């Protein structure tokens, strides 16, 4: 039995690092089991699992660097505005989700950082957008990654700028082994804790680099919900007031 205390999970770097340092060697585990806590006011005391395959989405974290030409805000015609380019790129990427992704697939694209400029009256030299693409469909993932790059370059070219796209990290969908998952769900049902309830066929829109472990050995992954049923449970995961 090996206990894996995974580091760097939030930046999707921990699993690969631990594999490189031999977590799956000497001896090689027969199977892997992972549990992730989740805050959910309406689902406290549940465990979610999926014996049918995909439990969590893939994730591709990207960084888009836009290069323009700095100038005084009073003379925009003398520069190339990277913020303007970034705004158009952000809107266009959302259109990819609403118009090119199959509505039956789980697919989200989020820009979580948009950094540019140092003063209110200066058009800066560059702007940086960072975000994530998540989906449960392999072909959708491949198509959107290709289209993202195409859209970014064409928009930058339209407004006379240039763009660089860096893939910061990539993680596949987390696939659960059906037999192992059903076996563990049965064990959970026998614990005998009052109010503990299993939710089968669950799919989380979040992502987890434990998926890289799941690519190599049979794996089951469960989400355990905890928290409070009163107003303390109103705050979601990653909120500074989450309890």
Question: What is each model feature region?
Answer:
Residues 1-124, 207-210, 233:
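Histidine/acidic-residue-rich, glycine-tolerant segments that coordinate divalent metal ions
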Residues 84-243:
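Metal-dependent amide/peptide-bond hydrolase catalytic core
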């Amino acid at each position: 039995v090996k206990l894996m205390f995974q580091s760097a999970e939030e930046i999707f770097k921990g699993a690969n690092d631990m594999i490189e340092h031999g977590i799956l060697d000497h001896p090689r585990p027969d199977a892997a089991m992972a549990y992730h806590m989740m805050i959910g006011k309406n689902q406290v005391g549940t465990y979610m699992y999926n014996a049918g395959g995909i439990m969590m989405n893939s994730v591709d974290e990207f960084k888009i660097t836009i290069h323009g030409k700095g100038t005084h805000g009073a003379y925009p015609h003398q520069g190339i505005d990277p913020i303007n380019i970034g705004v158009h790129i952000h809107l266009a990427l959302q259109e990819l989700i609403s118009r090119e992704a199959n509505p039956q697939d789980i697919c989200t694209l989020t820009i979580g950082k948009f950094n540019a400029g140092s003063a209110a009256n200066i058009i800066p030299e560059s702007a940086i957008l960072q975000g994530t693409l998540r989906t449960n469909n392999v072909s959708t993932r491949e198509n959107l990654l290709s289209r993202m790059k195409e859209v970014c370059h064409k928009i930058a070219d339209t407004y006379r700028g240039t763009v660089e796209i860096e893939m910061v990290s990539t993680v596949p969908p987390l696939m659960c082994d059906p037999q192992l998952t059903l076996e563990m769900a049965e064990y959970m049902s026998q614990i005998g804790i009052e109010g503990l309830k299993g939710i089968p066929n669950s799919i989380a829109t979040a992502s987890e680099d434990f998926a890289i472990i799941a690519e190599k050995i049979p794996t089951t992954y469960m989400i355990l919900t905890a928290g409070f049923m009163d107003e303390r449970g109103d705050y979601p995961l990653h909120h500074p007031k989450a309890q």
